[in-house]
């Protein structure tokens, strides 16, 4: 496990209460072993962090996208707080190197498990909120999510809807999605999905069916528009 200084540098925030940081990084697998120093895990913080993230992302969108209607704002928010986006943020922070977990969880692939990375990212947001205030947390989220705020159109944040609308307008055919295969352990499976519109097909993979479908829709839409 890495020291916390590098993580705090990436965050742009230094914790006053390091125990909050430790709790946010502690995997629930630690509960079963008395010899571990930490008797708390990230689950409660994750619960709070999910709510804080949703609130602040909503506020940021409300202020920055003044001309967007509620429906479009809701779609953008769904994209910004979805598992895939949160995992990307957590991966850029290299959170897998900081998660405190049992050897058994690590051997089972726990450090690369998208669920763990998502959970720790949300727990970390809650820890920052409790250690500081809503304004500081707002600024950190705005910085970490900055590149995702550059959405240009529906394709960026809702490729499945964009593909469906394009397909209906161009060919009167709805996209058809099919799960081709699932590989890997139950907690870290990789899904391969095919999407088809008329005679065009696209295959993509993801850590969830939803992620794979979004990737496939985005790639196929790009092909169709440039064909």
From Swiss-Prot:
It catalyses: Endonucleolytic cleavage to 5'-phosphomonoester. It is found in: Cytoplasm. The keyword Lyase does not apply. Its EC number is 3.1.26.3. One of its GO terms (cellular component) is cytoplasm. Residues 158-226 form the DRBM domain. Its cofactor is Mg(2+). The keyword Plastid does not apply. Residues 4-133 form the RNase III domain. It holds the Pfam family dsrm. Keywords: Cytoplasm, Endonuclease, Hydrolase, Magnesium, Metal-binding, mRNA processing, Nuclease, RNA-binding, rRNA processing, rRNA-binding, tRNA processing. One of its GO terms (biological process) is regulation of gene expression. It comes from the Bacteria. GO terms for molecular function: double-stranded RNA binding; metal ion binding; ribonuclease III activity; rRNA binding. The active site is at residues 50, 122. Mg(2+) binds at residues 46, 119, 122. Belongs to the ribonuclease III family. HAMAP family: RNase_III (MF_00104). Homodimer. Digests double-stranded RNA. Involved in the processing of primary rRNA transcript to yield the immediate precursors to the large and small rRNAs (23S and 16S). Processes some mRNAs, and tRNAs when they are encoded in the rRNA operon. Processes pre-crRNA and tracrRNA of type II CRISPR loci if present in the organism. This is Ribonuclease 3. It comes from Rickettsia typhi (strain ATCC VR-144 / Wilmington). The gene is rnc.
